[in-house]
Amino acid sequence: MCIRDSEAFGTDTFDEMYQKYENAYSVPKKKISARELITDLLKERAETGRIYIMNIDHSNTHSSFLDKVNMSNLCQEITLPTDPIQHIDGEGEIALCILSAINVGVVKDEELEEICDLAVRGLEELIDYQEYPVKAAEMSTLARRSLGIGYIGLAHYLAKNRVKYSDQSAWSLVHELTEKFQYYLLKSSNKIAKEKGACDYFDRTKYAQGILPIDTYKKDVDEIVKPEYNMDWEELRANILTNGLRHSTLTAQMPSESSSVTSNATNGIEPPRDYLSVKKSKKGTLKQIVPQYSHLKSAYTLLWDMPDNTGYINVVAVMQKFFDQGISGNWSYNPENYDNNEVPVSVMARDLLNTYKYGWKTSYYQNTMDGKVEDVITDPNSAMNDYIPPLTHTDNEEDCDACAI
């Protein structure tokens, strides 16, 4: 396969080109069993936890870009077009992470639209304010103005609503939340475009053609939650066609470990590993309790209590339906749930196929409980006495300005 043809990877013409070379007798070939290849991938991922997976086809079909997405970043949530540079002042494209996260665990429903608007406007100013040491990064960022706004505190949000990750009601709740989230972010970008003009590369997005995430998602997600909407997407579509968008993308779900700690929120979209955890960093250790522990202890989904990944996969799939970039989604396994304390390859294969079927663009870490206890406190009742008074939310705390984002 020549370089020119390899550039078709991820596009509609790739399958046709691949079959052409596959059928050509003059092209040397080496066959490997697909089952063997996938098994090797899954075993290596299980052993290292760090073989990341990107579904490049869906990363493009469900992208907001007409330009091809070739790759993701280390954390697997950024799916932006890139183009190589030959020297430091080259005119390729370097994609940057312009990120923010909203603590959905403490945001009231009536506040969400305003907070989404503030997040978009804050990052909008940051794009123009920051310095760019590399020309290719500056040109691409200023022209595309791609943002990645996501969640922290999703586990807290679900616990407040008394639903578990494995509940059908949780998937419906996340569908409702994420629909509003993406809608309000797009609405804000559309308003800013009316004020300042659309981004320079707006015509290189599917949004410019009136195509929205609800048009391009994997329709298998409808098996999880019916495609019923509460927002006026057709009005938004018309407004985008009229005034454009200031930003090529609005959403991405980052790991958000650090920001979750500083906000005393649960980590991103992840179930907590325990009620009281020890967070470690270069600056030392910090004990962190889940929000509203006294009131919501029984409502939280703990990571290692989940029997499998099904509920979590469905939550991420529903989010990805609306997100225009990617999601740092993890696979997690408790060997105690399986015979001989060993996670079968068949279980991992099922999760691989389900993440693909339900539209995951990328898969980040694979976590396996190893029985170590230094990172969590397994008996929080006695250990948390010194932490509950200052850290646990009260019934009135939602009205406290200090807790607002």
Describe the function of each predicted region.
Residues 1-5:
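Conserved small/polar residues in nucleotide/adenosyl-binding loops
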Residues 26-58, 399:
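Structured secondary-structure scaffolds
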Residues 28-32, 42, 66, 87-90, ...:
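Alpha-helix capping and helix-loop boundary segments enriched in small/acidic/polar residues
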Residues 389-405:
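Short acidic, low-complexity intrinsically disordered linear motifs used
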